[in-house]
Amino acid sequence: MKKALITILAVFLLGVGVFFGYEYATEPKIVDGVMSKKIDDKGRPIGLTSTFEPGDTVYFSAKRNRFWIDKAQIVWYKGEIAPENRFLVEEEVIVNKAKYFSTELSVPEGLEEGHYGVTIYVKGSDIMETKAEFDVKK
């Protein structure tokens, strides 16, 4: 009886361990992509928004969800998020102290009015982790 109970308990614990290990490995490694008007001293987004004016500096931030991820690639799009609409690719974006990947888009003559998008990938991966979209209006 005691041996059977120990065996059942061991199988149950192994199953729970496999389940949580699978969940941990397959969930997104970078989450919560947001657009903001500022970034604080620690690197967290402030003033979340999805609408900007042409002269604004646009900030994109996404939170790291796995401790071993320290570099990312961020891609900016003009229009729909599609390969042909890419206009800026930022390689080697490093996680900050607040555990966010953050970058900014600033154009001296101002951004054109329209719809934009941003995606983020773990460095070396083709799998999009999260995205955000925003509009530029006068």
How should these model regions be labeled?
Residues I6-T7, E90:
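General helical structural elements
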Residues E133-K138:
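Short beta-strand edge segments in extracellular beta-sheet folds
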Residues M1-A4:
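Positively charged n-region of N-terminal signal peptides that target proteins for export
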Residues T7-F19:
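Hydrophobic membrane-insertion alpha-helices, especially the h-region
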Residues F20-V107, L111-K123, I127-T130:
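Contiguous segments within soluble domain cores/interaction surfaces
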